Amino acid sequence: MRRRRYLRDRAEAAAAAAAGGGEGLQRSRDWLYESYYCMSQQHPLIVFLLLIVMGACLALLAVFFALGLEVEDHVAFLITVPTALAIFFAIFILVCIESVFKKLLRVFSLVIWICLVAMGYLFMCFGGTVSAWDQVSFFLFIIFVVYTMLPFNMRDAIIASVLTSSSHTIVLSVYLSATPGAKEHLFWQILANVIIFICGNLAGAYHKHLMELALQQTYRDTCNCIKSRIKLEFEKRQQERLLLSLLPAHIAMEMKAEIIQRLQGPKAGQMENTNNFHNLYVKRHTNVSILYADIVGFTRLASDCSPGELVHMLNELFGKFDQIAKENECMRIKILGDCYYCVSGLPISLPNHAKNCVKMGLDMCEAIKKVRDATGVDINMRVGVHSGNVLCGVIGLQKWQYDVWSHDVTLANHMEAGGVPGRVHISSVTLEHLNGAYKVEEGDGEIRDPYLKQHLVKTYFVINPKGERRSPQHLFRPRHTLDGAKMRASVRMTRYLESWGAAKPFAHLHHRDSMTTENGKISTTDVPMGQHNFQNRTLRTKSQKKRFEEELNERMIQAIDGINAQKQWLKSEDIQRISLFFYNKNIEKEYRATALPAFKYYVTCACLIFLCIFIVQILVLPKTSILGFSFGAAFLSLIFILFVCFAGQLLQCSKKASASLLWLLKSSGIIANRPWPRISLTIVTTAIILTMAVFNMFFLSNSEETTLPTANASNANVSVPDNQTAILHARNLFFLPYFIYSCILGLISCSVFLRVNYELKMLIMMVALVGYNIILLHTHAHVLDAYSQVLFQRPGIWKDLKTMGSVSLSIFFITLLVLGRQSEYYCRLDFLWKNKFKKEREEIETMENLNRVLLENVLPAHVAEHFLARSLKNEELYHQSYDCVCVMFASIPDFKEFYTESDVNKEGLECLRLLNEIIADFDDLLSKPKFSGVEKIKTIGSTYMAATGLSAVPSQEHAQEPERQYMHIGTMVEFAYALVGKLDAINKHSFNDFKLRVGINHGPVIAGVIGAQKPQYDIWGNTVNVASRMDSTGVLDKIQVTEETSLILQTLGYTCTCRGIINVKGKGDLKTYFVNTEMSRSLSQSNLAS
């Protein structure tokens, strides 16, 4: 039913939203809060009220028969109580039907109120002589429950309570004023009744207001907790997608656990890691096939591309290759420029790994052929495949990239280098694994690649089964069109590749706060497949917002079900059903130690109730010295308690507060923040009020007690004059019922301490109830009995002071107990939601930080911000062109000789452990402030690639002073020599003699992020290619730079030595320079010293 109502409301809200903005969603939220308020507060309380009233009716019948009262004398009572019981039972049955209750909520409230008022008047009119104090306690009960237990709103509750109290006052005033002999003390009694009713109205309104505020806070906390839970799930999904887009699942979870542990910090009792080595996330896998593929002709094409075109082409091409890899059970490892390599057989071994790689190679050639035929652009694929064993995983601390290492990987790389465009070049080992699945022909790879010749590798070309092999002169047959002839090759490529619709990198990322705002968004959909205009994005944002609202509302409905009336009495995971204690002792301790700034207002309300008790007793009691002294002492005590509670605020308002009064300021803070002072003050305050309610009853004069007759008025031993005298004395004791009413107000004063320990309030009220019953039924029973017998010939239950007092006190005790328990339950529930929200918020922050760490481990910080920003640009490809970026390649050529695969070093694993230490130590340098501008790009085997100048805004590059504009090139040189120093330190500890070979170049580059499956930040351009050549043609322990770079370095104070002219592959003859080692090191030391 709730679900149907919710859907109907959602439909109405959607229509309203279309007509008037966000009204619909607000209406949906309003209904949700109404449902929450109805089922969590109103429903349980009205059920409890009906149970209390029905229990009271049964108790009244039981007491009636227990006292042996004559049925003939109390027919009205015996008709009224069972009839009321039947009516309330029928209402109770209907209320328990949730759909009926929600539909007839106001009707039930009105019927119960009318029935209670009618019962009050029936008890008043048909019980004998009507007195001014008649049914005050019953009408006080009606007033109090109208506020606290009946589902009226505040306005309706005030109206109903005022009508109840004013009707009682008016009826009695009119009736008794016309009754002979009842006018003597009528005014003071009616005035006392008014004060009691005013007190009941104020206490009820106070209780209702605070409970509604508490419930609203609980609702908000529930919403916040559920929102945070949805966001946490979203963050976890996003983090998993992000992590799995960077690393394979088998290694990702292990690294994730370590990152989370690092983010959360060391926990108590957890042993610190005493291992001197960094963790190595590398595993060995056997029987895999490795594919290397290079796009032939792409370098020439790239020189004609704009930055956007280059990044778009690479993303589309490699996106297509990723799709082909997935179809053929291959895992892409890395993209190196325009080179793509992948492995089949990871992480789970596959018997057909060789077939998968060969099939993928053929599909890649076929895809490029289609591009070539459609665009007329002269590009092709050169593919090499080899099978064997690999070590795979991640090394270093930053910019993780999943990679593979082994001699077989090196051989696969040379299979590609020794191949032919448009063909799949395989080794004899791969051929054996194919088991005749493909026809092959001689490859003669040793002719084209010295490495293959040196290692005597027999190679073959796979014949594509889809068609006969074409001769090289027919491989390129451009399709000329009128439009194509007018367009650049890069434009033709870009337009054609758009039709592939490759996914964009990090398209699933959204802003970290998107789910905690009012207009929050949540994305659980797959990554988009292509460009969308702004309107489409806006539409999708609205649908995401709608999905988020629907999910939040669905979970709120579940939460409302979870805190329904019956649920708090059933077994709960967090709260014990009887005591309401938390199962978790730490949470229980935290709850009890919670600060309570509102405590002073509880004391204030209790003091107001005490003031009402004082006014009532002053109005009706004889004016005695004991009365004055007792209330005077009580007033002074309560005023002092009030002053201590409010001292903090009073002294803060006063500019001339004395230093001697500072202890009061501290005391006020201690009371608000510590439980034991609050408990002590609660006990003292309630004890004073409860005691003063009956204190003066013990000081009635002897004459007032002894002159009362001990039997009814018809006693034969009492003369008529004596009887008249007794009746007159009895009328002078009209104040006796007001002691009972004061006791009831005293019990109500206990309930105003809403967030004080429930068991403490229960104990105080129980002690008070027992004490009051001892007074009423034992110590002063003869006074009350005699007074009732003098006024009434056959007093019924509600006319007999002793019985009426005991029953009324018991009813109020049970009512206040239920309200106290209800209040305690929701206070604890609110605390629990806040506690869960706090923990989930911390977990969300950990997940957000984890996502940021993961993203910044792939991208530079400024690029990561681009993808984490609020804007919707993260659906577009990121690319940026720079005019001056310094690129460094630093390699350890000796590591190739050091790397061996044997049982001693666990088939090369221990060699990689050393490489991991080297790269990790290099990465440590990046955290130093002086190298904050250095951006690690990637590692390629034992080569470390980094760049500076990528953090500057391109438009601001030329705005800088010339010297400052090139400072980052000097930073790169300093970083290179810091790498040399790190490597020297590692050599000393590992007894090796590795030397670093460094190549540096500067100039324009294009930066971008490509690949949706494994997004990768990279830089491209001639500057990068030349820097790589500076390394590969360099000399050990030297930094080789181009002539242009050397001129810049010399202006920065570095000394460069000309090496001469060398031949650089693809670039011809270049004049290069070596940076002076000693000069650089001295500069580095001076910088560190400064």
Curated annotation (Swiss-Prot):
Which cofactors is this protein said to need?
A: Mg(2+); Mn(2+)
Binding sites annotated in the UniProt record for Mg(2+) 1: 294, 338
Glycan attachment sites: 712, 717, 723
Q: Which reaction does it catalyse?
A: ATP = 3',5'-cyclic AMP + diphosphate
| Residue sites binding ATP per the record | 294-299, 336-338, 382, 938, 1018-1020, 1025-1029, 1065
For this protein, what does the record note about how its cofactor is bound?
Binds 2 magnesium ions per subunit. Is also active with manganese (in vitro).
Q: Which CDD domains match?
A: CHD
Q: Which SUPFAM superfamilies match?
A: Nucleotide cyclase
Extract the InterPro entries matched here: A/G_cyclase, A/G_cyclase_CS, AC_N, Adcy, Adcy_conserved_dom, Nucleotide_cyclase
From the UniProt entry, list the residue stretches annotated as the region Interaction with GNAS: 904-921, 989-992
Which parts of the sequence carry Phosphoserine?
Answer: 490, 543
Q: What does this protein do?
A: Catalyzes the formation of the signaling molecule cAMP in response to G-protein signaling. Down-stream signaling cascades mediate changes in gene expression patterns and lead to increased IL6 production. Functions in signaling cascades downstream of the muscarinic acetylcholine receptors.
> What family is it from?
Belongs to the adenylyl cyclase class-4/guanylyl cyclase family.
- Domain note for this entry? The protein contains two modules with six transmembrane helices each; both are required for catalytic activity. Isolated N-terminal or C-terminal guanylate cyclase domains have no catalytic activity, but when they are brought together, enzyme activity is restored. The active site is at the interface of the two domains. Both contribute substrate-binding residues, but the catalytic metal ions are bound exclusively via the N-terminal guanylate cyclase domain.
Q: What is the protein's given name?
A: Adenylate cyclase type 2
